[in-house]
UniProtKB/Swiss-Prot annotation:
This protein's encoding gene: lpxK
Pathway assigned in UniProt: Glycolipid biosynthesis; lipid IV(A) biosynthesis; lipid IV(A) from (3R)-3-hydroxytetradecanoyl-[acyl-carrier-protein] and UDP-N-acetyl-alpha-D-glucosamine: step 6/6
EC number: 2.7.1.130
Function in brief: Transfers the gamma-phosphate of ATP to the 4'-position of a tetraacyldisaccharide 1-phosphate intermediate (termed DS-1-P) to form tetraacyldisaccharide 1,4'-bis-phosphate (lipid IVA).
Protein name: Tetraacyldisaccharide 4'-kinase
């Protein structure tokens, strides 16, 4: 297990050695708290877009189901007749220039795995740039939009936001509740009090402190042909290699177990790069991966490689709440 994986496990399981990092944690907390205070007071300038900006992010390190939720938000807004754009940092992307408009035919090295997935699934206009405010301005200059979704960027305060949605893994929660590097929190836990909504991935029902949503498997999709198969394509008890280069690989493996398959788990680091050699496992079995990983593997995929398509399913209460927020934001002068 890599050091980063061991550290992540310690943050969520708890480890007495982390107490040695508390002086650094105190320094980190002071820095991030002061940074946010400067933007809230107006001491540091932020860019406010002429259309509503909705930030979808988290305060923890590790996967929380952010990309499936963004896909749900895009589709939901479109059903309401709204034209939506997305901005993202584009983690790991190496575009020729910044800002960079992501197209469906680009490679993940150029566009980033998550932005490419979003564009391939939805065709939404999407701009990547570590400077999200610059990405928003470039996106609005390219075409008219009703609102913008910011993929992550909770801590990017140079971009003013009209709505903040914070996602948390319901099983792992906030780990040991401590900030980096002594814990998984990017900001202190009390930051949640200022968010407009907290959504718990894996909660089948709403909670007193937020809404619930689940990731529902919908189909198997072949990497080479694009063919979609029902989930019963593999019988109960099927052994298969399971690949996950996401923030919380175990959640993916648990999903496969829940489908009554027998996965041989192969966890990789989040945003990992793959090759045919790195995925040449023994014994020879069908291989199932996440959709985020699949966008990086199509060029060398074997015939029996599949990705598991999943859809975010928030509770009806969240859908109603979100519709009310949209009405409020879009009728602002």
């Amino acid at each position: 297990m890599a050091f980063a994986d061991r550290l992540l496990a310690a943050w969520y399981a708890g480890h007495p050695a982390l107490a040695l990092l508390r002086p650094l944690e105190a320094l980190y907390r002071r820095v991030v708290t002061r940074k946010r205070a400067r933007f809230l007071s107006g001491e540091s300038a932020s860019y406010r877009a002429p259309v509503p900006v909705i930030v979808v992010g988290n305060i923890t390190v590790g996967g929380t189901g952010k990309t499936p939720m963004i896909l749900w938000l895009i589709e939901h807004c479109r059903q309401l007749g709204l034209k939506v754009g997305v901005v993202s940092r584009g983690y790991g992307a190496k575009p020729p220039q910044l800002p960079w408009r992501v197209q469906a035919n680009q490679c993940a090295d150029q566009a980033g795995d998550e932005p490419l997935l979003i564009v391939q699934r939805t065709g939404v206009p999407l701009m990547i740039d570590p400077d999200r405010s610059r990405a928003v301005q470039a996106l609005l200059a390219s075409e008219p939009l009703d609102l913008i979704l910011c993929d992550d960027g909770m801590q990017h305060y140079r971009l003013a936001r009209d709505l903040e949605l914070v996602l948390i893994d319901a099983a792992r929660g906030l780990g040991n509740g401590r900030c980096l590097p002594a814990g998984p929190l990017r900001e202190p836990a009390e930051r949640l009090l200022d968010a407009d909504a907290v959504l718990f991935n894996g909660a089948n029902a709403d909670r007193a402190d937020g809404f619930g949503f689940c990731l529902q498997p919908s189909a198997l999709v072949n990497l080479r042909s694009g063919e979609r198969r029902a989930l019963d394509h593999f019988p109960a008890g099927q052994r298969l290699h399971a690949v996950a280069g996401i923030g919380n690989p175990q959640r993916f493996f648990n999903t496969l177990l829940g489908l009554n398959w027998q996965p041989v788990p192969h966890p990789f680091a989040d945003h990992a790069q793959f090759s045919a050699q790195s995925l040449a496992f023994s014994p020879q079995l069908p291989l199932v991966m996440t959709e985020k990983d699949a966008v990086k593997c199509r060029a060398f995929a074997a015939d029996d490689w599949w990705y598991l398509a999943v859809e975010a399913q928030p509770t009806p209460a969240f859908s109603a709440w979100f519709d009310n927020q949209l009405q409020r934001l879009l009728r602002k002068p």
